[in-house]
From Swiss-Prot:
Region of interest (Disordered), residue spans: 34-58
Gene Ontology cellular component terms for the protein in this record: membrane
Gene: NRAMP2
Organism whose genome encodes this protein: Oryza sativa subsp. japonica (Rice)
Protein name: Metal transporter Nramp2
Any matching Pfam family: Nramp
GO molecular function: cadmium ion transmembrane transporter activity; manganese ion transmembrane transporter activity
Keyword set, alphabetical order: Ion transport, Iron, Iron transport, Membrane, Transmembrane, Transmembrane helix, Transport
Length: 524
């Protein structure tokens, strides 16, 4: 019964309430838009799609299911799922497999389910309001809070991009047999924004097709590895359904959960769903869009889950319980695979590198895409596409080049840096999830598409759980890597400000906050 209520609450609430788009104000002529009207994809597959069926009333019925219509909506979910397949996730997968074998597959499954819930809410927000999360944050919060949220999101983007670009650079180094150094791979990867701009000029569907090819490359590469290494099917199934967690695999468990929810991906998905031409004055059309986006997002995440399973089980079969298990990472995983399995159909080292390159390239380009929406939405900047892409690319590529020049992939310091980058992204998660849940729970924002009470409660439980998991990661890093009384004291002050901001975001829409604010206003 609870699962049925949850499913129903992810669809619009019935009744005569006006649609969210009827209550939302139209975009100002000078406001930043996710997509111009000329760039949007038509979803009409028949003459009935342009008729006035359904209207905007509360009794409007969603049009009948159509496979052709689903195909028209397919795309945004697959761009979104790339964040579940970035080099950081692949590293978490291989380390979990090497350190814990098949034992953490159940956690990977449920982490993906939690990620799916977050992304479905993000898509719902974008469709129902006609605006993406960054824009709505600018309207919801005062200027100082908006700037703070923007800064936090940009930091998360930079942290993710460094890992993604380094992942691509490692793959290029492997494929070039070491001819191209790490910094050279970074330079090559830096030009991916030009590929992005080139494809974007040819339309959204061409861009989506390009990402579809990259996902297919990953799926084929890692499926070939799965076939060559032949992991145990029985242990795989047991790992999926039987929860196991030991003290020695806590770090890998935290890594799996922490990598799934990427802050910038929440902002990205709410913008991507606006790439279709939807008559937002008709409730039935908005309801239809939410329905199809839910389906295609779930299908995309099933694909990403399959790829993550392949990577985890390959390294579980090859390295669980071995001497290499503790020291394996992106930079040496290919060599270890080659030593273990040699050459069968094609050198497994290069199969790994091809999959890693597809992962790195796709995630860096989607990072650039997300950066455009984040900057434009929070700051209300209307810039030319090429200029926004160059600015957002520069934010990340400069620190990445510094990392590539001063660190070697086999240097132990690189592991510390990766851990620091994971922490950097972890601390940003509340600043994406709290505004998201706050907004989808407000009838003034969502209209009749406001989420139901069961979905709201589950969403807050997931958010608190993720915050606790990532809090553990932060405290672990603080205890093991932070040295010096002055540095620790400074970080304690920063932590206090950080927690205060989180409390503010949570309490801002409560009656207690309203009473406190009213009392403070009267006292002044």
């Amino acid at each position: 019964m609870a699962s049925r209520d949850l499913a129903e609450s992810l669809l619009p609430v019935g009744g005569g309430a006006a649609t969210a788009t009827a209550t939302a104000t139209a975009h100002d002529e000078y406001d930043e838009r996710a997509y111009d009207s000329d760039d949007k994809v038509s979803i009409a597959v028949s003459d009935s799609d342009s008729e006035d069926g359904g209207g905007g009333g509360g009794d409007a019925m969603r049009p009948a299911f159509s496979w052709r219509k689903l195909w028209r909506f397919t795309g945004p979910g697959f761009l979104m799922c790339i964040a579940f397949l970035d080099p950081g996730n692949l590293e978490g997968d291989l380390q979990a497999g090497a350190a814990a074998g098949y034992q953490l597959l159940w956690l990977l499954l449920w982490a993906t389910v939690m990620g799916a819930l977050v992304q479905l809410l993000s898509a719902r927000l974008g469709v129902a309001t006609g605006k993406h999360l960054a824009e709505l944050c600018r309207e919801e919060y005062p200027p100082w809070a908006t700037r703070a949220l923007w800064a936090m999101t940009e930091l998360a983007l930079v942290g993710a991009d460094i890992q993604e670009v380094i992942g691509s650079a490692i793959a290029i180094k492997i494929l070039s047999a070491g001819t191209v150094p790490l910094w050279g791979g970074v330079v090559i990867t830096a030009f991916d924004c030009f590929i992005f701009l080139f494809l974007e000029n040819y339309g959204v569907r061409k861009l989506e097709a390009f990402f579809g090819v990259l996902i297919a490359v990953m799926a084929v590469s890692f499926a070939i590895m799965f076939g060559e290494t032949k992991p145990s099917g029985k242990e795989l199934l047991i790992g999926l359904v039987v929860p196991k967690l030991s003290s020695r695999t806590i770090k890998q468990a935290v890594g799996i959960v922490g990598c799934i929810i990427m802050p910038h991906n929440v902002f990205l998905h709410s913008a991507l769903v606006q790439s279709r031409k939807i008559d937002t004055n008709k409730k039935s059309r908005v309801q239809e869009a939410v329905f199809y986006y839910n389906i295609e997002s779930i299908l995309a995440l099933i694909v990403s889950f399959f790829i993550n399973i392949c990577v985890t089980t390959v390294f579980a079969k090859g390295f669980y319980g071995s001497e290499q298990a503790d020291g394996i990472g992106l930079e040496n995983a290919g060599q270890y695979l080659q030593q273990k399995y040699g050459t069968a159909f094609f050198p497994i080292l290069y199969i790994w590198a091809i999959g890693l390159l597809a992962s790195g390239q796709s995630s860096t380009i989607t990072g650039t895409y997300a950066g455009q929406f984040v900057m434009g939405g929070f700051l209300n900047l209307r810039l030319k596409k090429w200029l926004r892409a160059m600015i957002t690319r520069s934010f990340a590529i400069i620190p990445t080049m510094i990392v590539a020049l001063f660190f070697d992939t086999e240097d132990p310091t690189m592991d510390i840096l990766n851990e620091a980058l994971n922490v950097l992204q972890s601390i940003q998660i509340p600043f994406a999830l709290i505004p998201l849940i706050t907004l989808v729970s407000k009838e003034q924002v969502m209209g009749s598409f406001v989420v139901g009470p069961i979905t709201k409660v589950i969403s807050w439980i997931v958010t608190v759980f993720l915050m606790l998991i990532n809090g553990y990661l932060i405290l672990s890093f603080y205890a093991t890597e932070v040295r010096g009384a002055l540095v620790r004291s400074s970080l304690c002050v920063v932590l206090a400000v950080y927690l205060a901001f989180i409390v503010y975001l949570i309490m801002r829409n409560t009656s207690l906050y309203s009473r406190l604010r009213s009392a403070m206003t009267k006292s002044t």
